Amino acid sequence: RQLMPQPLSGVSLRDKRKVTDALLKSGATINEFNTVRKHISGFKGGWLAKKAYPATVVNLILSDVVGDPLDSIASGPTVPDPTTFQDAIEILKHHGLWNTVPASVRRVLLDGKRGVIPETPKLGDKVFEKVHNIVIGNTLTASLAAYRSVQKAGLNGLLLSSRLEGQARDVGTMFASIAKEVAA
């Protein structure tokens, strides 16, 4: 059975993948990705906490998101979601995807906007009272470990940033420029 990628009832995993692929090609930000994913998921956006309630949940988190915002890491399965179905609809429209995403996704988002489907759990919901989110590793700890390994190997290393964000093609171009400068 699916857990992490589990879509909301009415949306197939294939349709969820189509939306994810379309968002990727559109240049959507990670926050935009997460907003849409949370609203077509049965697990993300606080739903794991809601399903686990009233149990105590201890979530040990490895973050690959700059700044470690808990609602963005893995799309926040155990934290309140500040976004709405309306936000997800606006993101798809902003990127020109609303009319091209699967009909099942549009239907779920519209049903959510109308209140037919419940909104993701929000700040103040009792389901979060016994949830403990602990970041045990992130981009900074990984970057520092890599840097120390380089030094230990007797190589000259330079840690430029653990907080780099942007489109991979743009960041890659920047790193290539730095490498050419160092080599010159």
Where are the regions a protein language model picked out?
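Accessory alpha-helical/coil subdomains and C-terminal extensions
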Residues: 52-58, 80-174
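Flexible loop/turn segments at secondary-structure boundaries
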Residues: 2-3, 40, 69, 167-168
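Internal gly/pro-rich beta-alpha loop/helix module
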Residues: 9-13, 17-22, 26-101, 107-108
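Hydrophobic alpha-helical hairpins/lids featuring a short glycine-rich hinge
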Residues: 1-9
